[in-house]
UniProtKB/Swiss-Prot annotation:
GO biological process, one term: 'de novo' UMP biosynthetic process
Catalytic activity: (S)-dihydroorotate + H2O = N-carbamoyl-L-aspartate + H(+)
Protein's name in the database: Dihydroorotase
Description of how the protein assembles with itself and partners: Homodimer.
This protein's pathway: Pyrimidine metabolism; UMP biosynthesis via de novo pathway; (S)-dihydroorotate from bicarbonate: step 3/3
UniProt GO cellular component terms: cytosol
Keywords assigned by UniProt, alphabetized: Hydrolase, Metal-binding, Pyrimidine biosynthesis, Zinc
UniProt-annotated binding residues for substrate: H14, V15, R16, N40, H133, H243, A255
This protein's record includes keyword Transferase: no
Top EC class, one word: hydrolase
UniProt binding sites for Zn(2+) 2: K94, H133, H167
Keyword Metal-binding among UniProt keywords: yes
C-alpha cells in the first residue's frame, strides 16, 4: 500500500536556533514544502529585522522549503512596524499570553488591554493572520477553556481578522470554531493521538510534556475526529519543539515534544487505522493553503509506503541527545521518496 502527499505544510513549527537549528531543521525542511515558524526564541522576534535575520538563517540551512515567518506580539508593533513587516512578506502575528509556555515571559499580560486591541485593529486592516497560544491562568486542564471569552471578544471585535487557535487541545473549543467564521485552529499529532496517560499514567514521561497539556480520552477522540474528516477550518500544525534530554531529565522540565522525524509516517498510520487516508492530503496541506491563502510554495511529492519504520530514539546536537517522539517503536508506514 502506498500514498503520495503533495506539498505538506506544517502550520506550527519550532526549529530553534544556531547549532540546534542545524540539527533539527532537516526533519521538517525535507518532507514539508512550508512551515509557519514560531518566534519565541531566547530573544523573541519582536520586529522586522530580527525576523528577517532568522528567516535567512533557516534558508541558509534548507532548500526547496518556505519558512512562513511570524512576529512575536508585543507593544512595539506600531502600524509602521506592521507595514514594514508586511512589505517584507511577514503575514503572521503570534500572541503568547505572558508566562503560558516556553519563552513566553515577554508575552502579553493584558489580552484585552487598549494597546493589544489597537495592534489587532491594525493587523486586521493590513490582513495579518493572528496565531494565539490560547491559554489563561487557572487549573492546568482548563487553561484553554478559560481563554474562550478572550477568543470570542477577538472574533467579534475583529470580524475580518483570521484568528488561529494554535494546537487545539480541549474539545470544548470546537464549538467556538464552528460558531465564528473567522476562528480556525491547528491540530498536533500528539493531541490527536495521546492522552494524559501517556504523560503520567505509568512512570512520568517528560518527553510527552507539552503546553497545552495533552488531555483526556474525550478530548483526544473529539480532536482526532476533526482531523480524520479534515474539517475545513482545521490545518495540521505539529508544534514540534526539541529540547535536550539533559533539560528534559532535569528538575525544571521544559514543555515541548520533538515529533518532526515521525510526522508523516505516524499520520499515515493513524489515518489508515481509522480508514481515513483519503482525507490526509486535505489535513496535511490543502486546508492550510486555503486558510492561509498560500500559493507559489515549493512543490513536493512525498511517497510513503506501508513498510516498517523503526523510530530512532534520539538525534544529536553538540554531543547532546534530543529524544524523538515514539523513539524505539516501529511505525507501519515509512517515507520512500521525496521529489
Amino acid at each position: 500500500m502506498e500514498i503520495t502527499l503533495f506539498d505538506p505544510i506544517d502550520a506550527h513549527l519550532h526549529v530553534r536556533e544556531n547549532a540546534l537549528l542545524k540539527a533539527v531543521l532537516r526533519y521538517s525542511s525535507e518532507p514539508f514544502s512550508a512551515a509557519v515558524i514560531m518566534p519565541n526564541l531566547s530573544k523573541p522576534l519582536i520586529n522586522t529585522p530580527t525576523t528577517l535575520e532568522y528567516e535567512e538563517e533557516i534558508l541558509n540551512h534548507s532548500s526547496n522549503f518556505k519558512p512562513l515567518m511570524s512576529l512575536y506580539f508585543n507593544d512595539g508593533l506600531t502600524l509602521e512596524e506592521l507595514q514594514r513587516a508586511q512589505e517584507k512578506g511577514v503575514r503572521f502575528l503570534k500572541l503568547y499570553p505572558k508566562g503560558m509556555t516556553t519563552n513566553a515571559q515577554n508575552g502579553t499580560s493584558d489580552l484585552l488591554g487598549e494597546k493589544t486591541l489597537e495592534i489587532l485593529e491594525n493587523a486586521q486592516k493590513l490582513g495579518f493572520i493572528l496565531c494565539i497560544h490560547a491559554e489563561q491562568a487557572g487549573f492546568c486542564l482548563d487553561k484553554e477553556f478559560l481563554c474562550h471569552s478572550v477568543l470570542e471578544t477577538f472574533a467579534l471585535s475583529f470580524p475580518k481578522l483570521k484568528i488561529i487557535i494554535e494546537h487545539l487541545s480541549d474539545w470544548r473549543s470546537i464549538a467556538l470554531i464552528e460558531k465564528h467564521d473567522n476562528l480556525y485552529a491547528t491540530l498536533t499529532l500528539h493531541h490527536i493521538s495521546m492522552t494524559l496517560d501517556d504523560l503520567l499514567g505509568g512512570s512520568l514521561n517528560p518527553h510527552c510534556f507539552c503546553k497545552p497539556l495533552i488531555k483526556t480520552k474525550k478530548d483526544q477522540e473529539r480532536l482526532l475526529s476533526l482531523a480524520l474528516k479534515a474539517h475545513p477550518k482545521i490545518s495540521f500544525g505539529s508544534d514540534s519543539a526539541p529540547h535536550f534530554i539533559s533539560k528534559k531529565h532535569s528538575a525544571n522540565i521544559p514543555a515541548g515534544i520533538f515529533s518532526a522525524p515521525i510526522l508523516l509516517p505516524a499520520l499515515c498510520e493513524l489515518f489508515e487505522k481509522h480508514n481515513a487516508l483519503e482525507n490526509l492530503q486535505a489535513f496535511i496541506s490543502d486546508n492550510a493553503k486555503k486558510i492561509y491563502a498560500l500559493d507559489n510554495l515549493p512543490a513536493k511529492k512525498v511517497r510513503l509506503s506501508k513498510t516498517p519504520f523503526i523510530v530512532p530514539t534520539h538525534t544529536l546536537c553538540l554531543n547532546e541527545k534530543i529524544a524523538i517522539l515514539r523513539g524505539g517503536e516501529t511505525l507501519s508506514w515509512n517515507i520512500q521518496e521525496i521529489a
